[in-house]
Amino acid sequence: AASDVYKRQMEWIIQKAIELGISEIQPVSMAHCVVRLDEGKTAKKLERWQKIAEAAAKQSKRDIVPVIKAPLPVALALTSCEADLKLMAYEVEEEGSLRRTLQKTPDAKSIALLIGPEGGISGDEFDLAAAHDWQSVSLGPRILRTETAALAALAAIQYETGNLGG
């Protein structure tokens, strides 16, 4: 799940996330999102994102093109996610490291990752996520930009699950 970010950043996230092996991207509209996707332009935006997904899948020699879903409000995205392991990168998390969390759940067949917008995940969004079994994880001591956090977390997940360099 990726919060709405600036146009070029979202396109870059889609491209790089697919190169790293994700199976789908669910854009999410969150309280602190700076950019709001105009509903009238959603179909055109999805078409563009899917073309980027197709090109990235081809470049990385993937047989299956990941799906870019239509943006959802955060509450619906958090409550409808059915992944075995639901992770939320939270900038003030001090206890749960991404690595330790992944090592505690080696049997997870599917992993969802929520990355917040530039303004971070709101308290209400955090509480709702926690109530629906999303685990808060730290990506380290620094505050990362949305696109950096997404790719750092994806690379770490791929590495820990044996899908990158191992």
Task: Give the predicted meaning of each segment.
Residues 3, 118, 142, 146:
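Glycine- and other small-residue-rich loops at beta-strand/loop junctions that grip anionic moieties
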Residues 42-46, 104, 155-156:
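Short, hinge-like loop/turn segments at secondary-structure boundaries
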Residues 84-120, 125-126, 134-137:
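Active-site/ligand-binding-proximal alpha/beta "capping" segment
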Residues 1-87:
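RNA substrate-binding interface of SAM-dependent RNA methyltransferases
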Residues 9, 73, 120, 148-149:
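Residue-level recognition of oxygen-bearing side chains
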Residues 123-166:
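Structured adenosyl-cofactor binding patch, chiefly the S-adenosyl-L-methionine
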Residues 72-78, 94-96, 144:
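A short acidic, often aromatic-flanked loop/helix-cap motif at beta-alpha or helix-coil junctions
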